[in-house]
Amino acid sequence: MQEKSRVFKWDINDFKEKSFKKPTLNLTWDYKFNPHYDEILINENIEWLKGTKLFSNESDYEKFISLKTSYMNAYLYSHGNREVFRYINRLNEYIYIIDDLYLEDSVYGQEWVNQLFDRNSKLFKEDHGSSFLWQIFDDIRSAGNSEATDYLIKKTKEWMDSVILFNSKEVHSNYTFEEYSSYRGVEVGMIFALACTKVHLPPLCDEIENHPLYIELLGKYFNSIQVLINDIHSFNKEIKSSRLGNYVKIAAYQLGSIQSAMDHSQKICNDYIEAMEEKCLELESIFPNNKDLETHLYLIKTIIAGNYYGSKDPNYPRYNGTVCEADYK
């Protein structure tokens, strides 16, 4: 079969039928909403954000707050205590801003990221935003687990590295899902998010962490499910962007229909959810009666469920409202 002509830029006008319905997933895993969300007061959050000096315009802080990233964070990081949630929320807000303003549009590159994570660098000594990030890490360490914080720092840098790598790739419409997710899997940020939600716990033992099945569970299944949840629910806000970095857009060109692309993404995601459940059971059979593994697998499932139900929540305006990142870019 002859390969279709490659498309490198998204254009909604390439499709006659522009209406679509977001699909539901066969997801029965438990999720909860962090009970300390209401204690992270808006006024406190605004003052903290202003202290980062990441925005140049005063009004941009209020616009960012209106995106309610803290609301989604309460879905993703539902198990931490008040202090853990406060500092993880701050880290995620910092990351959202860095991604939207600097990394996504390639304003900063790999050299900047390398310096950002080097406490002996010139950037750390001279740039307020860099020292602010490390203050957040120090606060997380004081409230959480030290080893888990080191792991989180590592995964935060890996995520930033992956954004830069993904931006350097020329994504086109003939990508298979496997090809797309191999680049997008880390860039979507959910391994970083998983490190956030586990920061109050001791890390898994090396025997489990380095087991091929556990690595496959995260790298293939967890990442792929999260990529599809993100792409399905962020499609609304990305529909006017020419960037092709969304699997629904890629599948739409392959299938000739946005709705067909949504339905196709749903099927892939449901298949991965079913397969991941089987992989979890297989891991538990290899490491029977291991309470640490059971806890970590539970958290892996709850962060997937939290991402899904948070993305669907009509009170979350980033995916379900009229406010978008472009308003403060």
Curated annotation (Swiss-Prot):
Free-text domain note: Contains several highly conserved motifs that are important for catalytic activity including the aspartate-rich 'DDxx(x)D/E' motif and the 'NDxxSxxxD/E' motif, both of which are involved in complexing metal ions to coordinate the binding of the isoprenyl diphosphate substrate in the active site.
Superkingdom, natural source: Eukaryota
Record key words, sorted: Lyase, Metal-binding
Enzyme class: lyase
Family as reported in the entry's similarity comment: Belongs to the terpene synthase family.
Matching InterPro entries: Isoprenoid_synthase_dom_sf, Terpene_cyclase-like_2
Name of the protein in question: Terpene synthase 7
Span of the annotated motif DDxx(x)D/E motif: 99-104
Function (record text): Terpene synthase that converts its substrate farnesyl diphosphate (FPP) into 6 yet unidentified sesquiterpenes.
Annotated EC: 4.2.3.-
Pfam families per record: Terpene_syn_C_2
Signal peptide extent: none
Span(s) of short sequence motif NDxxSxxxD/E motif: 230-238
A molecular-function term among this protein's GO annotations: metal ion binding
Organism, as annotated: Dictyostelium purpureum (Slime mold)
GO term, biological process aspect, one: terpene biosynthetic process
